[in-house]
């Protein structure tokens, strides 16, 4: 789910913290990607005939096609992707997962009704609501990435939290995900639409966390409280408090505790046994991968093993897979050039008063570390 309405709130209150970029601007960057979010996007994608991609025995293979071609697109643009897979969900997420189960059950009823009435638009809509990323989907994608020579990490808990930890450690440049809670976990840079379909022609949205805090006038702890008020995966929210009121209250009172002391709780009741403190602590001190124990390496693809897996087992076209392997090999030759800014050290910093700061300048030091050869170990 992420954080309700956070992207719009940032666009309204801190537009200077968002940059639109072309994918080619990330040449030489190491980027941590929320794998589950990607796989979900690939699974709900439908072809022009309205059907998902399947093998002859009816097994869905949309996730493999998406992972293969989107990863190649990133490699061709000089990006060094590392996929981060979710571990066990935190206990605080159990209520949210229960709600999702209820919504899925309701979607099943609505789907059956739409099928009975022959309403194709509703059939498509409710079918997507039933999509769930399974262990098999994850295992398929991990095998594919290994054969492609692309590293992945298994997070101990939430993938976005481990992505953010890698960014904060200066190990990668950014977190790529569609969920905005990567910012709540403190990633310095968050990228949206990096793995979107090329056909959609969506520019990459680049959010800068420190600039967001500066422009909306909050500390990182206050930003977490704001996100809890907006609505997150780990607890409920105060009734009747929308985004505009939430940011006004945080600016005025500074914390959820002070807000509860000063609002009319008869009009704006908080949830019973509200676990906002636990949610805050989860954002502040999440269970994350130990970046000192991982060593990321990008290797040559194993072409024959890819043919065996993707063609013999999953029935993809051999010509297309071999062509993809050629593109990967070619991209490896080009990526050795590296980023120009990795050869220079930077002194001083840009003034915070600048209206439109150049993203490359304002993040150069972090980008420099993100572009250096890895000190990671591939998570297995």
UniProtKB/Swiss-Prot annotation:
Recorded hits in SUPFAM superfamilies, A to Z, give: 5' to 3' exonuclease, C-terminal subdomain, PIN domain-like
Q: Which residues bind Mg(2+) 2?
A: 179, 181, 233
Ranges where the record places region I-domain: 122-253
User: Which residues are noted in the entry as DNA-binding?
Assistant: 47, 70, 158, 231, 233
What post-translational modification does the entry describe? Answer: Phosphorylated. Phosphorylation upon DNA damage induces relocalization to the nuclear plasma.
The Polar residues compositionally biased stretches are 332-351
Q: Which CDD domains match?
A: PIN_FEN1 (cd09867)
Keyword DNA damage in record: yes
**Alphabetical UniProt keywords:** DNA damage, DNA repair, DNA replication, Endonuclease, Exonuclease, Hydrolase, Magnesium, Metal-binding, Mitochondrion, Nuclease, Nucleus, Phosphoprotein
- The segment annotated Interaction with PCNA runs over 336-344
Pfam families with a match to the protein in the record: XPG_I (PF00867), XPG_N (PF00752)
The molecular function GO annotations come to: 5'-3' exonuclease activity; 5'-flap endonuclease activity; DNA binding; magnesium ion binding; manganese ion binding; RNA-DNA hybrid ribonuclease activity
Please give a single GO biological process term from the UniProt record: DNA replication, removal of RNA primer
Q: Where is this region: Disordered?
A: 327-380
Record's keyword annotation contains Nuclease: yes
Cofactor detail note: Binds 2 magnesium ions per subunit. They probably participate in the reaction catalyzed by the enzyme. May bind an additional third magnesium ion after substrate binding.
Superkingdom of the source? Eukaryota
Question: Where on this chain does Mg(2+) 1 bind?
Answer: 34, 86, 158, 160
GO CC terms = mitochondrion; nucleolus; nucleoplasm
Q: Where is this region: N-domain?
A: 1-104
List, alphabetically, the PROSITE patterns matched.
XPG_1, XPG_2
Q: What binding partners and quaternary form does the record give?
A: Interacts with PCNA. Three molecules of fen1 bind to one PCNA trimer with each molecule binding to one PCNA monomer. PCNA stimulates the nuclease activity without altering cleavage specificity.
Family per record: Belongs to the XPG/RAD2 endonuclease family. FEN1 subfamily.
Q: What does this gene product do?
A: Structure-specific nuclease with 5'-flap endonuclease and 5'-3' exonuclease activities involved in DNA replication and repair. During DNA replication, cleaves the 5'-overhanging flap structure that is generated by displacement synthesis when DNA polymerase encounters the 5'-end of a downstream Okazaki fragment. It enters the flap from the 5'-end and then tracks to cleave the flap base, leaving a nick for ligation. Also involved in the long patch base excision repair (LP-BER) pathway, by cleaving within the apurinic/apyrimidinic (AP) site-terminated flap.
| Matches recorded under HAMAP family | Fen (MF_00614)
What is the protein's name according to its record?
A: Flap endonuclease 1
Instruction: Provide the gene name from the record.
Output: fen1
């Amino acid at each position: 789910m992420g954080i309700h309405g956070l992207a719009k709130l940032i666009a309204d209150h801190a537009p200077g913290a968002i940059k639109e970029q072309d994918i080619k601007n990330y040449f030489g960057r190491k980027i941590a990607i929320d794998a589950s979010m990607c796989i979900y996007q690939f699974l709900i994608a439908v072809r022009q005939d309205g059907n998902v991609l399947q093998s002859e025995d009816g097994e869905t293979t949309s996730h493999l096609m998406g992972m293969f071609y989107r990863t190649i697109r990133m490699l061709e643009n000089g990006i060094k992707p590392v996929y981060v897979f979710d571990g066990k969900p935190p206990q605080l997420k159990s209520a949210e997962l229960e709600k999702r189960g209820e919504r899925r059950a309701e979607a099943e009823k609505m789907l059956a009704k739409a099928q009975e009435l022959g309403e194709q638009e509703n059939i498509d809509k409710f079918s997507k609501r039933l999509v769930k990323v399974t262990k098999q989907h994850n295992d398929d994608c991990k095998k594919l990435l290994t054969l492609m020579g692309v590293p992945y990490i298994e997070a101990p808990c939430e993938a976005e939290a481990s992505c953010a930890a890698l960014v904060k450690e200066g190990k990668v440049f950014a977190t790529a995900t569609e969920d905005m809670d990567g910012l709540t976990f403190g990633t310095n840079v968050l990228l949206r639409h990096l793995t979107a379909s090329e056909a959609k022609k969506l520019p990459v949205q680049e959010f800068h966390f420190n600039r967001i805090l500066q422009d909306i006038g909050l500390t990182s702890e206050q930003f977490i409280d704001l996100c809890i008020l907006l609505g997150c995966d780990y607890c409920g929210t105060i009734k009747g408090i929308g985004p505009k009121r939430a940011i006004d209250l945080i600016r005025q009172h500074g914390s959820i505790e002070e807000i509860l002391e000063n609002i009319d709780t008869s009009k704006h009741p908080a949830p019973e046994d509200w676990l906002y403190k636990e949610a805050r602590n989860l954002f502040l001190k999440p269970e994350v991968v130990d970046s000192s124990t991982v060593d990321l390496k990008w290797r040559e693809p194993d072409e024959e093993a890819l043919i065996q897996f993707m063609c013999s087992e999953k029935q993809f076209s051999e010509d297309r897979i071999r062509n993809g392997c050629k593109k990967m090999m070619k991209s490896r030759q080009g990526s050795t050039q590296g980023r120009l800014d990795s050869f220079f050290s930077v002194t001083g910093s840009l003034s915070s008063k600048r209206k439109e700061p150049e993203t490359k300048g304002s993040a150069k030091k972090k980008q420099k570390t993100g572009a250096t050869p890895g000190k990671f170990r591939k998570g297995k």
